[in-house]
């Protein structure tokens, strides 16, 4: 296996010699290969030999994946392949399941989040989460946005007002809601609720935003607005998004990881994944032959 990996690497280096960027080839334990083009962007997350179990169910197997900052990284794959489990591992939300066990490392900004001394609270401040179903609190729009800052000790009303406006502008919904800040968020449309949830996430100034099927419950117009917002947000945030929608992944992401049966089957630039995938199973999935 080692000799095979070395041969693959030497062959790839020869092919890319004299080019501006050189790709790194990775061979996973199940012999799936994926390439990660070198980039000037920093690595925000490096997953190394990650295995995860729910009881006896081996949900993630030997995951090795580097996520670049200020990119949108799409996680695709059929139901049950480990997509949502993976992103919930990135902020340790999987630990809410009593039977979960992990092995391997997830480095966030070069620190292993599984280290005993690593603060889960700090991690979840730096890494925000937007869920599949819009989940505003049963409070006013204003109180939804200020919940996180208040939890972190901010009490000054002027500062809170500024956070509310900045966050709602960041979620591209300030103009729609600026005159309704003290009305209940439950009275908003589904698309508006989801953008309020994104604004609530932005209010704590995260570094990374995890999105688990953020538009699956939305109508086409609301979906388009959220997709446009994702493109704007990547200027300041690193976004990792699970989606079943192949067109969405192709539209909004810079890189795509295809998960299959708990493995990373293929990972590359999104354009390459959708135009010239290296693996037959990847091609079959994105063309709709299974999934």
From Swiss-Prot:
CDD domains to which the protein is assigned, alphabetical: ABC_PstB_phosphate_transporter
Gene: pstB
Catalytic reactions on record: phosphate(out) + ATP + H2O = ADP + 2 phosphate(in) + H(+)
Enzyme Commission code: 7.3.2.1
Record-listed ATP binding positions: 77-84
MF-aspect GO terms: ATP binding; ATP hydrolysis activity; ATPase-coupled phosphate ion transmembrane transporter activity
GO cellular component, one term: plasma membrane
Subcellular location: Cell membrane
GO biological process: phosphate ion transmembrane transport
Function: Part of the ABC transporter complex PstSACB involved in phosphate import. Responsible for energy coupling to the transport system.
The protein's name: Phosphate import ATP-binding protein PstB
Predominant subcellular localization, coarse grouping: membrane
Group of enzyme by EC: translocase
Domain of life where this protein originates: Bacteria
PANTHER family in alphabetical order: ABC TRANSPORTER I FAMILY MEMBER 17
Keyword Cell membrane: yes
Subunit structure: The complex is composed of two ATP-binding proteins (PstB), two transmembrane proteins (PstC and PstA) and a solute-binding protein (PstS).
Alphabetical UniProt keywords: ATP-binding, Cell membrane, Membrane, Nucleotide-binding, Phosphate transport, Translocase, Transport
Organism, scientific name: Staphylococcus epidermidis (strain ATCC 35984 / DSM 28319 / BCRC 17069 / CCUG 31568 / BM 3577 / RP62A)
The keyword Membrane appears for this protein: yes
Similarity-based family: Belongs to the ABC transporter superfamily. Phosphate importer (TC 3.A.1.7) family.
């Amino acid at each position: 296996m080692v000799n095979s990996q070395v041969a693959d690497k030497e062959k790839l280096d020869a092919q890319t010699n004299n080019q501006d960027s050189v790709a790194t080839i990775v061979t996973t334990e199940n012999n799936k290969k994926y390439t990660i083009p070198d980039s000037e962007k920093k690595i925000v997350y490096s997953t190394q030999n990650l295995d995860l179990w729910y009881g006896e169910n081996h949900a993630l197997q030997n995951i090795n994946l580097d996520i670049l900052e200020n990119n949108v990284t799409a996680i695709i794959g059929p139901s049950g392949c480990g997509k949502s489990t993976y992103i919930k591992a990135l902020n340790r939300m999987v630990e809410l399941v009593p039977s979960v066990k992990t092995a391997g490392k997830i480095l966030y900004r070069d620190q292993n989040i599984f280290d005993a001394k690593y603060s889960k609270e700090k991690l979840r401040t730096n890494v925000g989460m937007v869920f599949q179903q819009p989940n505003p609190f049963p409070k006013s729009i204003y109180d939804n946005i200020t919940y996180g800052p208040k939890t972190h000790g901010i009490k000054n009303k002027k500062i809170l007002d500024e956070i509310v406006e900045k966050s709602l502008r960041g979620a591209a919904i300030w103009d729609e809601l600026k005159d309704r800040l003290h009305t209940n968020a439950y009275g908003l449309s589904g698309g508006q609720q989801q953008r309020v949830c994104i604004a609530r996430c932005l209010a704590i100034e995260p570094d990374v935003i995890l999105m688990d099927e953020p538009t699956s419950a939305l109508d086409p117009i609301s979906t388009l607005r959220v997709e446009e917002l994702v493109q704007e947000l990547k200027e300041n945030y690193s976004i990792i998004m699970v989606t079943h929608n192949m067109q969405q992944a192709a539209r909004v992401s810079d890189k795509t990881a295809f998960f299959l049966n708990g493995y990373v089957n293929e990972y590359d630039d999104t354009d390459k994944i959708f135009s010239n995938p290296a693996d037959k199973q990847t091609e079959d999935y994105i063309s709709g032959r299974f999934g």
